[in-house]
Amino acid sequence: MAKAFVFSLCLLLVFNGCLAARQSQLSPQNQCQLNQLQAREPDNRIQAEAGQIETWNFNQEDFQCAGVAASRITIQRNGLHLPSYSNAPQLIYIVQGRGVLGAVFSGCPETFEESQQSSQQGRQQEQEQERQQQQQGEQGRQQGQQEQQQERQGRQQGRQQQEEGRQQEQQQGQQGRPQQQQQFRQFDRHQKTRRIREGDVVAIPAGVAYWSYNDGDQELVAVNLFHVSSDHNQLDQNPRKFYLAGNPENEFNQQGQSQPRQQGEQGRPGQHQQPFGRPRQQEQQGSGNNVFSGFNTQLLAQALNVNEETARNLQGQNDNRNQIIRVRGNLDFVQPPRGRQEREHEERQQEQLQQERQQQGGQLMANGLEETFCSLRLKENIGNPERADIFSPRAGRISTLNSHNLPILRFLRLSAERGFFYRNGIYSPHWNVNAHSVVYVIRGNARVQVVNENGDAILDQEVQQGQLFIVPQNHGVIQQAGNQGFEYFAFKTEENAFINTLAGRTSFLRALPDEVLANAYQISREQARQLKYNRQETIALSSSQQRRAVV
Amino acid sequence: MAKAFVFSLCLLLVFNGCLAARQSQLSPQNQCQLNQLQAREPDNRIQAEAGQIETWNFNQEDFQCAGVAASRITIQRNGLHLPSYSNAPQLIYIVQGRGVLGAVFSGCPETFEESQQSSQQGRQQEQEQERQQQQQGEQGRQQGQQEQQQERQGRQQGRQQQEEGRQQEQQQGQQGRPQQQQQFRQFDRHQKTRRIREGDVVAIPAGVAYWSYNDGDQELVAVNLFHVSSDHNQLDQNPRKFYLAGNPENEFNQQGQSQPRQQGEQGRPGQHQQPFGRPRQQEQQGSGNNVFSGFNTQLLAQALNVNEETARNLQGQNDNRNQIIRVRGNLDFVQPPRGRQEREHEERQQEQLQQERQQQGGQLMANGLEETFCSLRLKENIGNPERADIFSPRAGRISTLNSHNLPILRFLRLSAERGFFYRNGIYSPHWNVNAHSVVYVIRGNARVQVVNENGDAILDQEVQQGQLFIVPQNHGVIQQAGNQGFEYFAFKTEENAFINTLAGRTSFLRALPDEVLANAYQISREQARQLKYNRQETIALSSSQQRRAVV
Amino acid sequence: MAKAFVFSLCLLLVFNGCLAARQSQLSPQNQCQLNQLQAREPDNRIQAEAGQIETWNFNQEDFQCAGVAASRITIQRNGLHLPSYSNAPQLIYIVQGRGVLGAVFSGCPETFEESQQSSQQGRQQEQEQERQQQQQGEQGRQQGQQEQQQERQGRQQGRQQQEEGRQQEQQQGQQGRPQQQQQFRQFDRHQKTRRIREGDVVAIPAGVAYWSYNDGDQELVAVNLFHVSSDHNQLDQNPRKFYLAGNPENEFNQQGQSQPRQQGEQGRPGQHQQPFGRPRQQEQQGSGNNVFSGFNTQLLAQALNVNEETARNLQGQNDNRNQIIRVRGNLDFVQPPRGRQEREHEERQQEQLQQERQQQGGQLMANGLEETFCSLRLKENIGNPERADIFSPRAGRISTLNSHNLPILRFLRLSAERGFFYRNGIYSPHWNVNAHSVVYVIRGNARVQVVNENGDAILDQEVQQGQLFIVPQNHGVIQQAGNQGFEYFAFKTEENAFINTLAGRTSFLRALPDEVLANAYQISREQARQLKYNRQETIALSSSQQRRAVV
């Protein structure tokens, strides 16, 4: 019996020690044991005051192999997703709803009044503000109350002016605005915010903080892809979210891979599903989980030149709302008018950017922070059917997003694709030449098969709405939409990902001489010709067997 | 005895568990345990119907450290190496023979008639073909037989015209060709093929499929280097070959590192040497090993719009010819005229490419697939002695290939070198500054010494024809040709690999002040001067001890 | 008891086998277990004849995670640090002293006479030298003695001329210099050397050899950072130093990670501190440790065309001075005049370089070795207070070095920063957006806190002069200078590293709308306004709590 004990202890040690070692080796650099892929729903959920964050377990072999992590964020009406940044560049696809997103670039100017109001007013405002700040500096805190009052009035007036429209503002002459008005202008000034809506793709570089707010009338749902194996991430392959406010739970704290919290929290081995609204032990400890929390409160207060009470608020102590909070009343800040104007504004910005970039010889970030990030376009809508790059009336349509239509993607080395296949429509069998593809099923269903280098189907599944699956680089894949059609969004881990089709007018087969086909496949030349010319569609293939002459 | 059992079981577990763990850590990112290098012949062989594929075990520490894999492919006369692609960019050196290579870029036009015949004819042809295809679409399959007959006649005629030469074609006026001729033109149309011959280097990007065919009168032998640790490979460090036809064996299935075949094949632990013509168990299982094999036959047939029988042929079921097959009769397809014209054609293409690239600011792939890959030059011959970049009449010559003479190498981040040293000629001791060097011995023999950072010779060997060895980055190396001379080809894992010599006119020693040498090596100033000036050759050093005044 | 034996053997095996496995997994690609950081002094020291080399243990988790290694080199007066190169690009910061550094680029011309004397003289000299070399070739060795004598005289004369100054030289007409003088000019010719002094940063690419010499009147102290996880290093993550002279000890031979020496040296497990002046076992073995040592002596002699005795001297046999040697007398070589002229010279070079680079479209190394490395500027002084990029009269100043002011850093993908904070001055809390920061404390002390993604302080320490600590990418950090002020140098692992501040005029907080702050931190709008506007300084924050109006 003692021997048995020795033996099992031995076993235990071996499996504790070595298997742990093996587990952490599944990084893409080491080994991709892709014997079996699976389309999966998220397997971890964090409940917050005004929404929830669901994550896919990034320790799964397919995620490890592709070097990605993914999450789905649901923000309720009037919910604010607290500012955070990540160690990996990410693409966000807005599955549903409307809202506002603010990305913060330290050192960039707080442009949000100027860009929406007449520049003349903006200039006056700035001078005024400059003056006010000096007064504030000289007169100290006592003036605070009064200023705030002024500002509230100014804000109301400012909003009225906005609604009167831009035309009127431009009509106002240089000196047309009475001096008095300026005293009641709104005071708030901040960096650019961006409207987001269903179909938008937002690109966020590693280390860049962003927040978002649902000001629509339904839930705002977004799917995020983190490219953890990107060159921009110099830490390890674990996705890490750094929150700058609140007392958030770790979204990716799965399977004990991430560091255990320092205080007041036991490791939760094997517990993937977080209990919602669990008693937060941090509260008793008086320690939050955001970046401010780790600083000495006194030192932080000194650095910010505020009192320690405010510093403690930054540190998120006694905050149990988690990372998505409910805003008291409506969130009230300077916002751009929606729609056409915004689009024109962005187009102008983009033109300017491209001119700059041509002068720079295509070198992004070459001229420092100010000339690039501050004016960088971060989003593009690919939900509009008119925007389709590939369209087959009887099969479906595909829209692609790459560095040509969203230049920041060149820097991030990511691209994306959104597709809608009609019932039984077939996505031509193909392989991804230079990227992994991470596919999220927006709506509908499809039969998907993925094939490895040995000719084995490592994925053969009916994928459903809300699931996500990975098609590794170079692996063959075929997809056929189900009865409900198939609507998906695909993240690709290269700036201009492209595919090589195995059927259709641009397929591999078409590129080969007839006799090579005939010999390779042991078929007649007639059959070879059929292989080459029986399909006139390119990527979106209709399912009917009849020949068509559509070119 | 029971104790002994426990003990050995323990040991077993430890070595099974932990050593396996250690083994898979030898990726370049982790550790290079380069205590001993060795020049080796391939240690795995796959016999196919019309040739063989030999591979070097990529799990060896030196290969793992350098992040490369290598194979040698022998194609018999009239043999066709089936189309395949790899997860790693590769360089192919043609050691012997002649043939044709076709690289497939999905979406690129099928240009092979136009580029070899007059453009006027090509245009007419295209229109005709367009018309024929529409007819085909309208009239369906019945016409197939007839078309094929027409086409055969057209092909014969086409070949006659080719032999009449290009000049005559150009003399023919716009309308000079009778309408009747066009009906008998050859029909086949496919992507560019490239003639290959001894001394050619061909660059194939990751994920790009290619096939090759031996139409010469001797065996076609090629050595392939796969740069698996390239950024272009987002999978793991294992080389993977994806075949698009046939029922191939896994060329790199060594030491159980690759995934075992899903069906019908047991793991073959430790069995490096494949039995030739082994009974293929796939045949009984009815499952092939190419990419098509993994798709559902019915779905594949639907996608291709062919019958299921043809789809099954694509899947390579019941095919036991392996990856190199014997062509029935001669492989008959549109081919470019050989020699001077081809060269001129390519040069024109290259000029155009360079102009484009200058306009683009040197950004390859920046403008999408069509403008780059489709017109990209993939090969360059470095076998011609006249082409030598370094030549020493009494020692030997070296030709280099980098992104300047083959621009795609900038994109692939690879370069190459071919050298021929006369008997006793010395390759100056040197180190590779920015690349690993993987050297294949084409002919002859040499004494090679490689030195690590501790001053230890980790390779000291008489290398022979057919062997391959790795000189890791920064390691010192010296080579002296043997009695038969020394002819080699070196793959380098950086686009413009360069070396730093330790002897010769451009050596490290020459760059140092006399007194630094005198003090560092505890020698007199006179000796220091000798170190600097006793060798007037640069890299290829003659072995005689006499001083020479050649500068 | 036997059982106990089995058990402990088991344990032993498990811990030997598996823990070793775990240890080597701490590469950045795998896992960053950064639960605890620490500012540390070097923990390994090698004593040499004229100085010492101290290294930080690169196997520590923080170094492994950041992919860096570091050393501090102290060269005594008249000491020569023998030529070496490394597998990683490095930045060298000169903490103290003056000296000369020579970087060797194989194949670049030996330009050092021309650039320091009048070009007219230089031209004559070159012609003369050419002639002399030919004579040497023709007349062989007998002339050696005589030449050397001439040269010594020439050298003395040359130095006098230098001291007479450059103006005079330029006044001398084309033919003004008597023929006789030219016969007595100094003979030595070598590649460019560069003067180094306190405050200089020198960038050395991977695989590029350099040597340095202390010709000042105090110790020359330098701190080196090696970016081992750089793309330029294709070997593993271990820093490797390849010496080209002497019989050096392995500076980074810690914890048995590096390969044990082949001969005559036992593994020294756990022995971090090297005994100074230990009996060198190599002497008995007759084998050195530099790159030449590993070559066959006869073959080396043949390659260099020198006798075997000289070859043996190159191999460093019987040399026990280690890597820093004392020069006999003064090291006597061609040197540039110091100061203003040098600066002007470099500025001219830089202008030229930038013009070239604009023409090249910003593509470094695109045109081969000759046009880039040979004329590349390698150093820049950031010690001068006037050079500050950020300055706050009551807090301190910061100078940054990136690819804009030292273009080679774009190629190396490194940047740097030097800062001086006055007593109690605060470096604004911030995070590194795109780089790790490796900080060396030059003088003074500071309180430093580093915070991870869970809000835990993983570093909270009073850092002292001579210590080094790592601030990982994206981790929050705050620093407050102690009573003695705080002077530091920070290496950053990205070409244009930038930070995002959490306090100050450009902070994250300032970019957010008031109401977002109010809701996120559960504070009033007034408090939110204070958070945004209470600090007018940007990065260097003064510690006093009073409000200031300085903008």
UniProtKB/Swiss-Prot annotation, chains A, B, C:
Ranges of compositional bias, category Polar residues: 282-293, 311-323
GO molecular function: nutrient reservoir activity
Positions of the UniProt region annotated as IgE-binding: 118-132, 145-159, 161-175, 225-239, 281-295, 510-524
Comp. bias (Basic and acidic residues): 339-350
Disulfide bridge positions per record: 32-65, 108-374
PROSITE patterns according to UniProt: 11S_SEED_STORAGE (PS00305)
SMART domains: Cupin_1
GO cellular component: extraorganismal space
Chain residue ranges for the region called Disordered: 111-194, 238-293, 311-361
GO BP of this protein: protein hexamerization; seed development
Keyword Disulfide bond: yes
InterPro entries: 11S_seedstore_CS, 11S_seedstore_pln, Cupin_1, RmlC-like_jellyroll, RmlC_Cupin_sf, Seed_Storage-Functional
Domain of life: Eukaryota
PTM comment, free text: Proteolytically processed from a single precursor to produce an acidic and a basic chain that are linked by a disulfide bond.
Keyword Iron set for record: no
Cited Pfam families: Cupin_1
Expression sites (tissue/organ): Expressed in seed (at protein level).
Motif (NGXEET): 367-372
Ranges of Low complexity composition bias in the record: 114-124, 132-148, 168-185, 254-275, 351-361
Signal sequence region: 1-20
Keywords: Allergen, Disulfide bond, Seed storage protein, Signal, Storage protein
Family under the similarity heading: Belongs to the 11S seed storage protein (globulins) family.
Subunit record text: Hexamer of two trimers; each subunit is composed of an acidic and a basic chain derived from a single precursor and linked by a disulfide bond.
Descriptive protein name: Prunin 1 Pru du 6.0101
Species per Swiss-Prot/TrEMBL record: Prunus dulcis (Almond)
Lineage: Eukaryota, Viridiplantae, Streptophyta, Embryophyta, Tracheophyta
